[in-house]
């Protein structure tokens, strides 16, 4: 394969948009993704969940967002390699070698859009949890809301995922119980208000105590008080454990394993950029909408370095298409 201007590692939303923007700025680009399907977390973990904070889209599911991004990407020349895991990235004489389990591709610049890395759901921590998960009694994310139609569902968690899924499940489930170990939720204020004004039964501050057949028992925090009700399914939204793997030697990362970036989203290795949840800097906000902007910064910066007659600021898309 010929030497490219840019290789993007990771085909989540930020990676897909970055590839489109790179093509719009005239760069030759390839994307490498370890999963068999592009789209990252929205496509693979919550394809039916509604996302509300993408500019210009009042609400969009993870699956539809991925579909839209792929349609946008189809407007420019690119190559997308799925099912390839990047093992390491090396740089020699100003050229990067991106070595995967299947190939060795070369580029003048690399953009990491690997998200939070390898994700492993946090579990309830009970003895028979694996068996209950195999039986479909316990889930950690939802790929199809149909599995919960007409069911009594308990959602454990206090963040945005637990709140959002509770609202989504209310539309299809018979009953939804939201269980949080604290009295206050950590999600967006508007979402918390929607939950509190819905038909969702909120139980705070309670924790899991026991689950036998369909009988769920909760224990009140710092009190000798239990609560029992019938449940068909449990959804655990305690977040994910992340495993960030450093792909390049001497790449500077922060304490949380994310790659340190400057104001132009470049790492300490010249020509190696980062955007989205894989990046870290002062004031970092781990939001998809922010990641799109970070990708634009990175692409414009590398375009300026690769093509010295190009301005740092890209033109308007309306003048290109």
UniProtKB/Swiss-Prot annotation:
First-tier enzyme category under EC: oxidoreductase
Disulfide cysteine pairs (residue numbers): none
Presence of the UniProt keyword Oxidoreductase in the record: yes
InterPro entries: FAD/NAD-bd_sf (IPR036188), FAD/NAD-binding_dom (IPR023753), Fd--NADP_Rdtase_type_2 (IPR022890), Ferredoxin-NADP_redctase_2 (IPR050097)
Cofactor(s) the record lists: FAD
Gene3D superfamilies: FAD/NAD(P)-binding domain
Cofactor note: Binds 1 FAD per subunit.
Example GO molecular function: NADP binding
Pfam family of the protein (one): Pyr_redox_2
Reactions catalysed according to its record: 2 reduced [2Fe-2S]-[ferredoxin] + NADP(+) + H(+) = 2 oxidized [2Fe-2S]-[ferredoxin] + NADPH
The EC number(s) this enzyme carries: 1.18.1.2
Keywords: FAD, Flavoprotein, NADP, Oxidoreductase
Binding positions for FAD per the UniProt entry: 33, 41, 46, 86, 119, 277, 318
Subunit structure: Homodimer.
UniProt record similarity statement: Belongs to the ferredoxin--NADP reductase type 2 family.
Classification via PANTHER family: THIOREDOXIN REDUCTASE 1-RELATED-RELATED
Listed name of the protein: Ferredoxin--NADP reductase
